[in-house]
Structures are given as C-alpha cells and as structure tokens.
C-alpha cells in the first residue's frame, strides 16, 4: 500500500527536497506552502499534491488538514515550516516575538492537533518535526529562535509518551547548517544599537567559509529525514549533518558550561 507524507514549508529548502525524495521513493506527498500559486514545478511531479497552508492561520490549518485526510490516511506528518529570528533580544518588537512563536512553535502544535484525531483513530503514523541543532545547543543572538526549537524538542519528547499507546511515533530531525536560501528568505533580524559590535562578530563567525563548508545540502538532510521515518528504533531526536553531530557530541562530552565557554570564544572572541 502506498504511504503518504504531509509536509509543511515545502516551497524551498529542506521541505522541497523532502517532497521530491519521498515522491521518488514512491510515496504520495502532500506538499504545503503559503503561496501555492507561485509553485510551478512540484505539482507536476508524479505523486505530489500541492496545497496552500499558512501555519499561523488556525482556520486554514483546519481546512487543509480536513482536505488532506479526505485523500486517505496520513502515514507521516512532517512539521517543517519555520524561520529564524536573529539579533539582540532587547531589540525584538512584540510583533517579531509573536510571529516567531506563532510560526515555529504554535504552528507546529496547531497542525499536529488538527491531524491527531485521524492519526489516533487509524492507530499508526509518525509525527516528525524539524527542530535544529539550535534546539540542542545555543549560539549568541538567536535567543527567541532557540526558545522555539528547544520548546519543540521538549514538546516532542513529552508528546511521545502520550501517543505511544495509540501506535504513534514522535520524532525530531535536528539539522545543522543547510546550504539553502534560509538565510536570505527565512531569516529576520532585530536591531539595537547597543549590541552592534557583538552582533557583527557573531555574524562574521556564522559566515566563516570554513565553518559553512561543514554544512549539508538540503538533499543530504532530506536523506536523514527519510532514514528517521524508516527507523524502527525507540528514538526521538535525529541529529543531521556533520556540523550538528560534532556540536552535539562535544556538548555532551565536555558538559554545558565548558561548551558555552567554547561557543563564546568562537563567536565573540
């Protein structure tokens, strides 16, 4: 029987690469995005159905979930939509805070709630959420983004206990740097004059060519997504990318405080 994956944030980057990979593997793919009218390629791929979905719109979430479930059982719900809010926390506007939480955290929760009755009734399925290495470690000037990603990791770990009796699995994929247009299309900056020098140092460290060379392509992380979906192990978090694996391994090995000292030296000097 053909399996189906529902993907949020499928217009670019990891979401798009995952949609193409699963379609290639013979899955039915429901690829969602805020502006489906601008998508001219995915809908032509055999097995891919494109739908509109803004994860900050509860009414549209309910409508899209109903339409997707009407097509048949959903084997995998892949919560992938998100963006980064970077810069000084003090400079963040209330609108920026609300938008970040609505998209990265509440959006995931609302989409999952919309699908849970169907998933629970069918008695099988996987809820997979893109977090980030930023959900396991922290870097300077990403505090609100980290709050959402750490929140998703904790939410997923707790939710797994609730849903296991119903045959449902809960997993996260935590990638490091991805060579995509995330930085240009999916990054919003706060501004505050008191932090400009420190922010400049941090951004320079993030942009360092040697550091960026350790990142992954969207296709490589999509492979990790597929592996996580197919894995039967009793495991929640799947760290993806050599840079992310190195960071997380080091944090576990040296402890939180020594790891923080290393991050401070790397990004702030």
Residue ranges and their predicted role:
Residues 11-12:
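Conserved glycine-rich cofactor-binding loop
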Residues 112, 148:
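Active-site helix of classical SDR
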Residues 90, 137-144:
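Active-site loop immediately N-terminal to the catalytic Tyr-X3-Lys motif
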């Amino acid at each position: 029987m053909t399996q189906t994956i529902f993907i949020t944030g499928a217009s670019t980057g990891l979401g798009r690469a995952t949609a193409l990979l699963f379609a290639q593997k013979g899955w039915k793919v429901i690829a969602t995005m805020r502006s489906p009218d601008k998508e001219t390629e995915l809908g032509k791929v055999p097995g891919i159905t494109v739908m509109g979905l803004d994860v900050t719109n509860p009414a549209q979430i309910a409508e899209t979930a109903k339409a997707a479930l009407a097509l048949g059982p959903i084997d995998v719900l892949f919560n992938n939509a998100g963006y980064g809010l970077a810069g000084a926390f003090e400079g963040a506007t209330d609108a920026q805070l609300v938008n970040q939480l609505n998209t990265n955290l509440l959006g995931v929760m609302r989409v999952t709630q919309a699908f849970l009755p169907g998933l629970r009734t069918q008695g099988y399925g996987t809820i997979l959420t893109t977090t980030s290495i930023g959900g396991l470690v922290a870097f300077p000037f990403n505090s609100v983004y980290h709050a959402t990603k750490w929140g998703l990791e904790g939410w997923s770990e707790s939710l797994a206990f609730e849903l296991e009796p119903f045959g449902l699995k809960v997993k996260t994929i935590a990638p490091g740097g991805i060579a995509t247009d995330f930085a240009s299309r999916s990054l919003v900056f706060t501004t505050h004059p008191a932090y400009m020098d420190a922010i400049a140092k941090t951004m320079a460290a993030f942009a360092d060519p040697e550091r960026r060379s350790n990142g992954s392509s969207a296709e490589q992380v999509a492979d990790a997504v597929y592996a996580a979906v197919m894995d039967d192990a009793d495991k929640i978090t799947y760290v993806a990318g050599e840079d992310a694996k190195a960071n997380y391994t080091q944090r576990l090995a040296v402890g939180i405080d020594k790891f923080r000292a290393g991050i401070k030296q790397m990004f702030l000097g």
